[in-house]
Structure formats: structure tokens, C-alpha cells
A protein has these predicted regions:
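Protruding loop/beta-arch "assembly-hinge" segments enriched in small, turn-prone residues
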Residues: 2-32, 37-40, 266-309
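Alpha-helical scaffold segments that mediate packing/assembly in large oligomeric complexes
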Residues: 70, 77-80, 85-168, 298-299, ...
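Short loop/turn segments at secondary-structure transitions that flank enzyme active sites
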Residues: 54-59, 87, 96, 118, ...
Length: 309
């Protein structure tokens, strides 16, 4: 007796694969520095000079009725902020755009912005791939305020800890930026009485803050744990300005060369390709004006902790 059936292998040509109409992906991450720093008015040229108070006047007691009054002065200096360009070109064959079920250009642009945010944070905080036009990064400027771990109550909030280093310069800490991997260490952090510093119970979400200063854990991939585990400081003292906001242009003519060898890689017109070009220009500075607790402006409003030896 025949027992034949139409099996899956025999009907495979008639079975369509389902394509989910949404792409599974994380939300693009922004720049933590641009979130916390102070934005100035847009730059009108590639350089902006910021007047900064560099010397404070003094006052003196006068001895007796006919004592001589002393003189004093006040001075200012210019801090130069130079715009650097951040850009990328992404070539795409026109046939790929036509055949795709998704808006490739629309998918790429947010990821380019995310990549730019990571580059900005890495250059300003750690000096990673820093453009030559920019000033020294935050960690290099704060070398004298470095604290060697491990992460514990004393190294963060105690005498000689991160917060103390910033406060010794006459600054208050308004934020702490840390690697996402430091959360595990913070969850186990105890105060001097042996109580959890952050968690009051095991059910509720943990709100991370230190002495009133919120903690941030950027997820754009820019935080360099090989150079620091956490950075504390007065982030509002960082100023930045945009010379050219993110500008997107679709190129369909011209050639694209290898930046190293100058060899032509793509000829857009000849190969029926387009290229997404994204550009932005910005500058930043840490003016650090003189104060009564930082009269010569030599103290930096940042400190950071590194892993112990």
C-alpha cells in the first residue's frame, strides 16, 4: 500500500522565508561630554578666543591714619578654541539600495552620529585619536589628581580620594563618569559602617550618585578602562562650540581614494555607486579661570581613578 506524502523537502520551493520588518538593534548612543559640558554659541570661524580671568586683585589693610595704600591689579588671558573636523564617507552600490527592503541610508545615519559621539568622548576625555588642533585631553591635564584603586569608599569620597582632589582646587564635583564594568564594584561598595553605599534593597532599581553628584555610565564604547575606571569633576567647566553641525550629503560623482596609498578604490559614476558623506566641526576648551582657591589656574577640576597595581 502506498504511503507517499508531500514532505517539506519536496515543497521547499513553495515555502517562503519570513522576513521580520524590523531590525533588531540597540538605540544609538550620544556623547556624554556634550551632555554634561557647557555649550557656547556656535563658532563663526575655525578659531574662537575665550577671555579668561588669569589674575585676581588683592586688598590690603592700611596701618594708621596716614598709612600708604598699596596697589593691585587684575589680568585676563585668551584661551584659544580650535575647530577640528570629524567626517566619514560610506560608499553603497545603487543596486544594493534598490534591492534592499530597508531604508539603508536611514539606518546608517544614526550609527554615524553614534560613532562621532564616541570619537568626541574618546578624544576629549582620554586623548584617543585626538586631532592635532585640539588641546590636551582631560586625563592628561588631571594627571596630578590621579588616584590609584581599588574602587572603595576611601578612594572615592575619603581624604585624598577623587572628590577630595577636585575640592582641593576649589571646585565642586557635579558628575562622575565611569565604565559600565565598574557597576559591579559599586554595587558591592560599603560605607564606613559596612552598609551598602547604593543599594537599600534587592528589588528596586539602583540610583547611582555620590555625594549628590550623579554617576553616568556611557555605552557608546568610548570609555577607555585601560586609562581610567572613573572620572570625577566639574564637567560644566568644559566648554565646547559647534563650527559646523552634522551635515549629510549624498555623493554620486567622483572617486574615493585610499587615505594611506591614495589608490582609487571606487569610481562612483563608473560603478553606479553613491556615497553618504557626513561631516561635523567642533572645538572645546577647559578655560579654568583664576579663583580665590585656585589663584594661578594651575589646579584642574577633574580627578580619576585607575586600577590598582
Amino acid at each position: 500500500m502506498a504511503t507517499s506524502i508531500i514532505a517539506r523537502t519536496g515543497a521547499e520551493a513553495l515555502i517562503r522565508d519570513q522576513l521580520v520588518n524590523t531590525i533588531q538593534q540597540d538605540v544609538p548612543k550620544s556623547s556624554i561630554v556634550m551632555q554634561l559640558a557647557t555649550r557656547l554659541a556656535n563658532m563663526t570661524s575655525n578659531q574662537t578666543k575665550i577671555p579668561v580671568l588669569s589674575m585676581l586683585p588683592l586688598a590690603y589693610w592700611v596701618n594708621g591714619d596716614t598709612g600708604m595704600k598699596q596697589t593691585s591689579k587684575q589680568e585676563w588671558k585668551n584661551v584659544t578654541m580650535t575647530a577640528a573636523e570629524l567626517a566619514v564617507i560610506i560608499p553603497i552600490p545603487e543596486a544594493v539600495l534598490a534591492d534592499s527592503s530597508f531604508d539603508i541610508m536611514g539606518e546608517v545615519q544614526p550609527r554615524v552620529r553614534e560613532a562621532m559621539a564616541a570619537k568626541i568622548d574618546g578624544a576629549i576625555l582620554f586623548g584617543n585619536d585626538k586631532p592635532t588642533e585640539w588641546t590636551t585631553d582631560i586625563l592628561t591635564q588631571a594627571t596630578a589628581n590621579k588616584v590609584t584603586g581599588p574602587i572603595d569608599y576611601a578612594k572615592i569620597l575619603g581624604d585624598g580620594g577623587m572628590f577630595a582632589k577636585v575640592e582641593e582646587g576649589g571646585f565642586g564635583v557635579d558628575g562622575v563618569v565611569g565604565s559600565l564594568s565598574t557597576k559591579a564594584q559599586l554595587r558591592g561598595l560599603l560605607d564606613k559602617n559596612g552598609r551598602p553605599l547604593f543599594r537599600s534593597d534587592m528589588q528596586g532599581a539602583t540610583n547611582y550618585a555620590l555625594d549628590g553628584a550623579p554617576l553616568y555610565f556611557p555605552e557608546n564604547g568610548a570609555f577607555d578602562v585601560s586609562k581610567a575606571l572613573m572620572i570625577a569633576g566639574n564637567f560644566k567647566k568644559i566648554v565646547y562650540s559647534i563650527r559646523q553641525d552634522v551635515t549629510v550629503k549624498i555623493l554620486d560623482q567622483g572617486v574615493i581614494q585610499d587615505p594611506s596609498t591614495k589608490e582609487i578604490m571606487y569610481n562612483l559614476a563608473q560603478q553606479d555607486m553613491v556615497a553618504l558623506r557626513v561631516i561635523m566641526r567642533m572645538g572645546w576648551a577647559l578655560p579654568n579661570p583664576s579663583t580665590r582657591l585656585n589663584t594661578d589656574g594651575s589646579k584642574v577640576p577633574f580627578s580619576y581613578i585607575v586600577a590598582g597595581e
